[in-house]
Amino acid sequence: MEAKGKVVGVIGNLVTIEMVGTVSMNEIVFIKTGGQSLKAEIIRIRDGEVDAQVFEMTRGIAVGDDVEFTDKLLTVELGPGLLSQVYDGLQNPLPELATKCGFFLERGLYLSALDRNKKWSFNATAKVGDFVVAGDFLGFVIEGTINHQIMVPFDRRDSYRIIEIVGDGDYTVDDKIAVIEDDAGGKHIITMSFHWPVKVPVTSYKKRLIPNETMVTQTRIIDTFFPVAKGGTFCIPGPFGAGKTVLQQVTSRNADVDIVIIAACGERAGEVVETLKEFPELTDPRTGKSLMERTCIICNTSSMPVAAREASVYTAITIGEYYRQMGLDILLLADSTSRWAQAMREMSGRLEEIPGDEAFPAYLESVIASFYERAGVVVLNNGSVGSVTVGGSVSPAGGNFEEPVTQATLKVVGAFHGLTRERSDARKFPAINPLDSWSKYRGVVEYEATEYARAFLVKGNEVNQMMRVVGEDGVSIDDFVVYLKSELLDSCYLQQNSFDSVDAAVSFERQNYMFNILYKILQSDFKFENKLEARSFINDLRQNILDMNLAPFKQEKFNKLEINLKNLLRSKKLDF
């Protein structure tokens, strides 16, 4: 029976609807008010009533307004044309909305996610008579720098036989590409695009693998000490202004992935505008073209409705899973998951649910876990491998890592890059605290060597704390040298200058080379007459290595500086 309903209550963006008929959880409904249709999602079903969260401002909605039930879940449209786009959480293209509305967006306006008129050059790879299942390739089109595979829609559950497929040529996303037939003789038309519900993980693959290949971000402290694997998960918690967004932008520019998806869910509008302005101007180091050609941005700022903020996270991960099905490596950056959790807290409060810690819903951990678990490495039906790596920034109030969102995130991620106010105030970029952070993945340098270096950082920090109490004269010269060595490692390796063309992105080979130099220095047993001599010598080493960091790898300037470094060390009778 077709459902019918009327509004009986409104609290903020939560609308209670009295209905007759059959409805399903997470079904999309449209509330008719003032000549507009406002999209909403059912989030609770009770006897004769449903509660729906509205994706727009609810001003003007009145008791008695009609409600139209669609019998569909919240979906995204998947097909060629997603890359280089900027969408809101409901996959409305923002540049087109701006053209249509100007500076202030109208309520109830929903546009097509893909360009219906653009023609794509289709190249068929399947042929009539082939048997296919969900996720199998029928052909491809060129989208930017990638081969965008046209696939059998993921909602097809059986095996099908291709009975018709078009020849190579130019087609729109709505044109018929193929016709497939099921076992019962039913025929199904395939176009270049299809819809998929955002809260349902894509499972059209053979099997999942354990992530073990390092995703090189070209940021030394991450790749060497706290690495991230392709298909893995990581989080970047830190106080406001510690550099979370900048670190994510640097990672998206330099990471060893095919496609970057940025979900700006609940960030300040100024930061989102900065991202939208910068990305088209950034040059992709891999292709020499604009970085936007392999980027998709989903943005819902903190000033947009709460429900759409939550939807943007799911929209982004679904688009990521779609491109993973093509055998590509995807990096999804969610900034910030704290705002998403706050949106859940707001809705939970309006639903009058029993609150958990700090009034967050009791199911916060399971929702966060279900999001991060959609990352992973998968083997596709044709044997190729694709991955989605998920990185979420967390903005705990006052930088308190004990709050519920950070703790729930730490339980499910494979790497933790904790930013601290102390390091960001000291102008250390990235402001990742090497003493608190950790990773379960394999990095570009041997684990034993990095643990040896980390032990130096821990010991150096202990000596530093001691010197703050008793002064420099209160520690032995051996302890003082340990402190100087830890500071050398920190300034020359853990910190990076993202404004310098050379130091901003450090290759896998260069990281190994420079770490080995510093590793040998840490192992060396220096003999000094006094602390003044020790400080002077280590400072000379530091300046030399910092200059090497800014010189192109293994070119004339770099080689000269390396000879200077060896001469410095030989002056202490060390064979280097």
From Swiss-Prot:
It catalyses: ATP + H2O + 4 H(+)(in) = ADP + phosphate + 5 H(+)(out). Coiled coil: none annotated. The keyword Translocase applies. ATP binds at G238, P239, F240, G241, A242, G243, K244, T245. Keywords: ATP synthesis, ATP-binding, Hydrogen ion transport, Ion transport, Nucleotide-binding, Translocase, Transport. Its EC number is 7.1.2.2. It is an enzyme of class 7 (translocase). The keyword Signal does not apply. It comes from the Bacteria. GO terms for biological process: proton motive force-driven plasma membrane ATP synthesis. One of its GO terms (cellular component) is proton-transporting ATP synthase complex. One of its GO terms (molecular function) is proton-transporting ATP synthase activity, rotational mechanism. Produces ATP from ADP in the presence of a proton gradient across the membrane. The V-type alpha chain is a catalytic subunit. Belongs to the ATPase alpha/beta chains family. PANTHER family: H(+)-TRANSPORTING TWO-SECTOR ATPASE, V-TYPE PROTON ATPASE CATALYTIC SUBUNIT A. This is V-type ATP synthase alpha chain. The gene is atpA.
